[in-house]
């Protein structure tokens, strides 16, 4: 489960991936009638996707199809066992009830938590996976919301080394920048 399954341990309550993943609060979208799809990290865990793994040393353009239409996410290793997942989330199909749409960025650190004991997202200071929120307010981490329209990145946004900066869990700024050059769900 990607919500805080044990909110009293070890720190405080938070909402994990919130409405962005069926394994968090996304199973309750539309009163449970239209749950969200799993996140890219969840789809990878169950072997349901084969992500694009770009070489960040090279410039490149990537056209992402919405995950709700069978699209494939990008996966970038930023440290040993730590990844950035980049996924297009649209308002189509099971994604229709999401709190927003655009480029959703997850940061996953496999060294945090205990997957076998279902203790992966128990501590917001050491999440197994979290959303890198475009608006920068960290509302999911703080337990202030279950996801918002400000979480995904949109046309013109940048993230990585510049724009919304991404640091690995060892305190190193990533060496690449991604710019959202266009955004369409067609």
Identify what each model region corresponds to.
Residues 62-186:
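Extracellular low-complexity, Gly/Ser/Thr-rich intrinsically disordered linkers
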């Amino acid at each position: 489960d990607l919500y805080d399954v044990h909110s009293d341990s070890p720190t405080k309550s938070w909402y994990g991936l919130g409405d962005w993943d069926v394994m968090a609060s996304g199973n309750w979208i539309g009163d449970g009638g239209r749950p969200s799809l799993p996140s890219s990290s969840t789809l990878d865990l169950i072997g349901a996707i084969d992500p694009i793994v770009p070489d960040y040393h090279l410039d490149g353009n990537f056209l992402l199809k919405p995950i709700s239409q069978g699209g494939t996410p990008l996966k970038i290793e930023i440290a040993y066992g730590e990844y950035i997942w980049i996924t297009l989330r649209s308002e189509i199909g099971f994604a229709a009830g999401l709190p927003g749409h655009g480029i959703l960025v997850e940061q996953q650190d496999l060294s945090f938590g205990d997957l076998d004991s279902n203790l992966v997202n128990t501590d917001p200071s050491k999440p197994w996976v979290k959303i890198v929120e475009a608006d920068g307010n960290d509302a999911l981490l703080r337990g202030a919301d279950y996801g918002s329209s400000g979480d995904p990145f949109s046309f013109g946004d940048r993230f990585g080394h510049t724009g919304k900066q991404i640091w690995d869990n060892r305190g190193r700024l990533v060496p690449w920048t991604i710019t959202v050059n266009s955004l369409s769900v067609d």
